């Protein structure tokens, strides 16, 4: 029951005052927080006690959730919102007073001695790492109704993104444990940040597939909550137009991963277990594990607290640039600056041409691909100071130039890669640049949008993402000495792409270049129309001439040699229209499917030595 003090406090809001008898002491405290922060409008339409009581209690359940899931609670959320909305209204630039310069980092070229050494070092470090996948999104923007991690990475084998990620982590785990001198086995923790949209479907995908070979105890799902929407510049919380007892909510952004890790207690547990690194990555870049061993090697060698994986970036390209920003007061930070902010920032800082390509043909500011490697100790220390909170931003859509009313409610947002914004200048923050063909092929645009992309710019579609995998694998084998025939150009779903030989392999076959080189010898060649899928570990390619389709699946104790001339009718590629609803979504968004006319397929389930020749 509410005390006299409470009654006096709430007397200015009669509709709430008359309902105090319904509320628990905790709920009364939450009501106080709301009133102290300018939210009395939430109760204006409340009827007297005895009417809709269940709905009123449900309202406070939601308020309790919103309060507990945000660092500092709703009071902190509303305070930050008021500040950011005031800045937005006057057009304040968050980078005022800052000058950009190129930070220090490591540029790696695939196949060089330095690259190979960094890969080897990265494998050694892998058992000291935890992997965090940020997977809160559905595939609607792609024209796919499932969760994005369930989408096939490529359709030669049909392996989905999540399976590929898990098998890559397991391959690194095994290789790293083998190298470690004390002979101990350590399981690499794998964390998946989900949302209301993806949580149950991600869990179902894992359980239906026995976690793709990972121990269920290795995998932790952390679900992010949404945040309250804001109706106006006073940061008044927005009610659902169809339910006066419910606050409108929207996703807060992938920056939530830091507060979730902080509150989960996992960071402390990992430190106790001797872990040293936390790797963050996003849900649909099918090439990213090509870059992880070497970038982890760079982190260990350079002792970076923060290492952003990056790719060469053309000036003004629509991808954030990693920049060192130095303020007139002397403080500095190394962060991702969005492309539309980088150019004006440079022009305002004495670079009249803004963001331009240097003698390399690329911008000196490398392109951020949202993959971070953080050193665990300093990361945990920093989160203890911030409670896991990340610098936020707000992006209201105003009705007109007075900037007094919004077209629709807005909310605060945060991004995973903004973590370094709160770090002291002494923090060692760097980057690792790798070839785009090796490391970056995100799948985020639907066929219609991808077809509108200006020629020469990346499509970032399911079509280009799959073709990039075949290109990367073909180029890796070329550098290992295989004569892989050059690609042909083809238009699929309105996008002109290079079609290379359809070559895929399981991560355990070759996680790093030096391992792949050991498995290839003699004179090998693969024609452009060929398909080759290697699903075993101990498969060796020697003097192979492939013109057709070859699928090899073998247990670890089977040693398999692929050689001689293997020629058959192979698999053909058939165009599919993305509007053709008779075709499954995951196929039609690519614009093609395989017609498996003929192949040589070997499944070896017994130990021993085998030779596969036509």
UniProtKB/Swiss-Prot annotation:
One of its GO terms (molecular function) is UTP:arabinose-1-phosphate uridylyltransferase activity. Optimum pH is 7.5-8.5. Inactive at or below pH 5.0. The gene is USP. GO terms for cellular component: cytosol; pollen tube. The lineage of its organism: Eukaryota, Viridiplantae, Streptophyta, Embryophyta, Tracheophyta. Required for the synthesis of the intine, the pectocellulosic inner wall of developing pollen. May function as the terminal enzyme of the myo-inositol oxidation (MIO) pathway. May also play a role in the salvage pathway for synthesis of nucleotide sugars. Can use a wide range of substrates including glucose-1-phosphate, galactose-1-phosphate, xylose-1-phosphate, arabinose-1-phosphate and glucuronate-1-phosphate. It is an enzyme of class 2 (transferase). Pfam families: UDPGP (PF01704). It comes from Arabidopsis thaliana. Optimum temperature is 45 degrees Celsius. Keywords: Acetylation, Nucleotidyltransferase, Transferase. Ubiquitous, but most abundant in rosette leaves, inflorescences, stems, stamens and pollen. It catalyses: a monosaccharide 1-phosphate + UTP + H(+) = a UDP-monosaccharide + diphosphate. Its EC number is 2.7.7.64. It comes from the Eukaryota. GO terms for biological process: nucleotide-sugar biosynthetic process; pollen development; UDP-alpha-D-glucose metabolic process; UDP-D-galactose metabolic process; UDP-glucuronate metabolic process; UDP-L-arabinose metabolic process. The modification N-acetylalanine is found at residue 2. This is UDP-sugar pyrophosphorylase. Disruption phenotype: Plants produce collapsed, nonviable pollen grains. Male sterility. Its cofactor is Mg(2+); Mn(2+). Belongs to the USP family.
């Amino acid at each position: 029951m509410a005390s006299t003090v409470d009654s006096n406090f709430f007397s200015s809001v009669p509709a709430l005052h008359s309902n105090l008898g319904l509320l628990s002491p905790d709920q009364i405290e939450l009501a106080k927080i709301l009133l102290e922060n300018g939210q009395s409008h939430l109760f204006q339409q409340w009827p007297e006690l005895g009417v809709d009581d269940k709905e009123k209690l449900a309202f406070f359940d939601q308020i309790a959730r919103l309060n507990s899931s945000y660092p500092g609670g709703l009071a902190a959320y509303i305070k930050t919102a008021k500040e950011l909305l005031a800045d937005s209204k006057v057009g304040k630039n968050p980078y005022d007073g800052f000058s950009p310069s190129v930070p220090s980092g490591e540029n790696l070229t695939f196949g060089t001695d330095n690259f190979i050494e960094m890969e080897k070092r990265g494998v050694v470090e892998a058992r000291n790492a935890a992997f965090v996948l940020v997977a809160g999104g559905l595939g609607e923007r792609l024209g796919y109704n499932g969760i994005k991690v369930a989408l096939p990475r490529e359709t030669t084998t049909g392996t989905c993104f999540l399976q590929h990620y898990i098998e890559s982590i397991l391959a690194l785990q095994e290789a790293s444990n083998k190298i470690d001198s004390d002979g101990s086995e350590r399981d690499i923790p794998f964390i998946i940040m989900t949302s209301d949209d993806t949580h149950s479907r991600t869990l179902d995908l894992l359980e239906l597939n026995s976690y793709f070979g990972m121990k269920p105890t290795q995998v932790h799902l952390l679900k992010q909550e949404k945040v309250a929407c804001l109706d106006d510049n006073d940061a008044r919380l927005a009610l659902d137009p169809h339910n006066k007892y419910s606050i409108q909510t929207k996703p807060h952004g992938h920056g939530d991963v830091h507060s979730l890790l902080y509150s989960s207690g996992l960071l402390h547990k990992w430190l106790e277990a001797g872990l040293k690194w936390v790797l963050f990555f996003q849900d649909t870049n099918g090439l990213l594990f090509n870059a992880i061993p070497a970038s982890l090697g760079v982190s260990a060698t350079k002792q970076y607290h923060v290492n952003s994986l990056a790719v060469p970036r053309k000036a003004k390209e629509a991808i954030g640039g990693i920049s060192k920003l130095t303020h007139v007061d002397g403080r500095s930070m190394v962060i991702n600056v969005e492309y539309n902010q980088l150019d004006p920032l440079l022009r305002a800082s004495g670079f009249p041409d803004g963001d331009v390509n240097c003698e390399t043909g690329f911008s000196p500011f490398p392109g951020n691909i949202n993959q971070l490697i953080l050193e665990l100790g300093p990361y945990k220390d920093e989160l203890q100071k911030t409670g896991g909170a990340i610098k936020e931003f707000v992006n209201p859509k105003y009705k007109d130039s007075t900037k007094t009313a919004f077209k629709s409610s807005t909310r605060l947002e945060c991004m995973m890669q903004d973590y370094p914004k709160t770090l002291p200048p002494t923090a060692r923050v760097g980057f690792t640049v790798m070839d785009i063909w090796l490391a970056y092929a995100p799948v985020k645009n639907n066929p219609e949008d991808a077809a509108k992309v200006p020629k020469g710019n990346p499509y970032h579609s399911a079509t280009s993402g799959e073709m990039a995998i075949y290109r990367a694998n073909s180029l890796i084998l070329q550098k290992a000495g295989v004569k892989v025939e050059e690609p042909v150009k083809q238009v699929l779903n309105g996008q002109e792409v290079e079609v290379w030989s359809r070559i895929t392999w399981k991560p355990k076959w070759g996680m790093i270049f030096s391992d792949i080189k050991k498995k290839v010898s003699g004179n090998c060649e693969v024609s452009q129309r060929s398909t080759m899928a290697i699903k075993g570990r101990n498969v060796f390619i020697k003097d192979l001439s492939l013109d057709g389709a070859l699928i090899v699946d073998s247990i670890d104790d089977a040693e398999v040699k692929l050689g001689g001339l293997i020629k058959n009718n192979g698999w053909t590629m058939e165009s599919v229209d993305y509007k053709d609803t008779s075709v499954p979504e995951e196929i039609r968004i690519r614009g093609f499917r395989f017609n498996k006319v003929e192949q040589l397929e070997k499944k070896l389930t017994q130990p021993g030595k085998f030779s596969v020749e036509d």
